[in-house]
């Protein structure tokens, strides 16, 4: 127990940690610069299991006092004054807390520990509790607005707004719950926009039931079949390409035409009772016709080139 007691005009501090003495007996002048004995206060420790100091006027007891200044070793501070700091709110506003004794408190404990130490603060119908900022608590709902003796100011570790029986959190989340900012700018991936604004025009396709398409398909099939037959008729037609095969086919056809012309000549066919011509004669006639036909074809090519 430590005791500091000086003159009444100077500060007095009385500390009784873990004392079970009656805290209602005024003994000294305290925390007052004047000589008035009515403003004296006594500093005593909380007689519960917590280390701390309690300030209250020397003319009142703990049971009927409305002013409490509680310094606890667990970082719980309560300041009560008989006067309200702000003019009382009588219009039925949402926060009539300035209407009574103002209590300032800092709480480092859990809410259950605060309730065991100061049930008046926790059980109030309207309270504004904070854990990282200042808040106001009041029980003006249970008492008339003219009673200025029960207003509280609470400072604790997280911000909780309590109006009636609802508790709403008004403070941002703790820094430990936030993800660290790495400084990287995350950008949404954008799809490359095409010149047609992403719209692809369908190709104009003809329906398979179109008569023109069906006819063209059938024509191509017939041409391929005839070419295969011609390759088989021309000697060595399957061993060369299509152009060479066609040229040979043309020459072969002309040769056949000459043979037909020679064989159809009357001179080669004697009259009835006559003698049939020799094969050598027929061959000479065919060669003459072929040579003449080649000269005619060459002349036509030269004239076409000259033109």
Swiss-Prot record:
Keywords noted in UniProt? DNA-binding, Nucleus, Transcription, Transcription regulation
Which cellular compartments is it found in?
Answer: Nucleus
Region (Helix-loop-helix motif) location: 221-256
Principal localization? nucleus
List where Polar residues composition bias occurs.
Answer: 12-28, 183-197
> Which domain of life does the UniProt lineage start with?
Eukaryota
Any GO BP annotation: root hair initiation
Pfam families the record matches: HLH
* Upregulating conditions: Induced by jasmonate (JA) treatment.
Q: List residues of the bHLH domain.
A: 207-256
Segments for region (Basic motif): 207-220
Record's GO cellular component terms: nucleus
* GO terms of molecular function: DNA binding; DNA-binding transcription factor activity; protein dimerization activity
Q: Where is this region: Disordered?
A: 1-49, 167-215
* Disruption-associated phenotype: No visible phenotype under normal growth conditions, but the double mutant seedlings rhd6-3 and rsl1-1 do not develop root hairs.
The record ties this protein, via PANTHER family, to: TRANSCRIPTION FACTOR BHLH83-LIKE (PTHR45914:SF59), TRANSCRIPTION FACTOR HEC3-RELATED (PTHR45914)
Q: What does this protein do?
A: Transcription factor that is specifically required for the development of root hairs. Acts with RHD6 to positively regulate root hair development. Acts downstream of genes that regulate epidermal pattern formation, such as GL2. Acts with RHD6 as transcription factor that integrates a jasmonate (JA) signaling pathway that stimulates root hair growth.
Q: How does it assemble?
A: Homodimer. Forms heterodimers with RHD6. Interacts with TIFY10B/JAZ2, TIFY6A/JAZ4, TIFY5A/JAZ8, TIFY7/JAZ9 and TIFY9/JAZ10.
- Its recorded name reads Putative transcription factor bHLH086
Q: Provide the species name.
A: Arabidopsis thaliana (Mouse-ear cress)
Provide the gene name from the record: RSL1
């Amino acid at each position: 127990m430590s005791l500091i007691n000086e003159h009444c005009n100077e500060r007095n501090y009385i500390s009784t940690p873990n004392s079970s003495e009656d805290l209602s007996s005024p003994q000294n002048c305290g925390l007052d610069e004047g000589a008035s004995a009515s403003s004296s206060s006594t500093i005593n420790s909380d007689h519960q299991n917590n280390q701390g100091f309690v300030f209250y006027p020397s003319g009142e007891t703990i049971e009927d006092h409305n002013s409490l200044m509680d310094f606890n070793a667990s970082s719980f501070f309560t300041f009560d004054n008989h006067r309200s700091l702000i003019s009382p709110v009588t219009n039925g506003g949402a926060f009539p807390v300035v209407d009574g004794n103002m209590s300032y408190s800092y709480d480092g404990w859990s809410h259950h520990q605060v309730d065991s130490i100061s049930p008046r603060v926790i059980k109030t119908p309207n309270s504004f509790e904070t854990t990282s900022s200042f808040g106001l608590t009041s029980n003006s709902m249970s008492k008339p607005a003219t009673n200025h003796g029960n207003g509280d100011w609470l400072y604790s570790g997280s911000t909780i707004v309590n109006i009636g029986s609802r508790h709403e959190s008004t403070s941002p989340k703790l820094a430990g719950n936030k993800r660290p900012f790495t400084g990287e700018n995350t950008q949404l991936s954008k799809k490359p926009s095409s010149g047609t604004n992403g719209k692809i025009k369908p190709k104009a396709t003809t329906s398979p039931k179109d008569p023109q398409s069906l006819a063209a398909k059938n024509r191509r099939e017939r041409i391929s079949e005839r070419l295969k037959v011609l390759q088989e008729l021309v000697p060595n037609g399957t061993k060369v390409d299509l152009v060479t095969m066609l040229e040979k086919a043309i020459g072969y056809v002309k040769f056949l035409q000459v043979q037909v012309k020679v064989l159809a000549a009357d001179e080669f066919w004697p009259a009835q009772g006559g003698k049939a011509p020799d094969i050598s004669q027929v061959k000479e006639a065919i060669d003459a016709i072929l040579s003449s036909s080649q000269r005619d074809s060459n002349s036509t090519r030269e004239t076409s080139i000259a033109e």
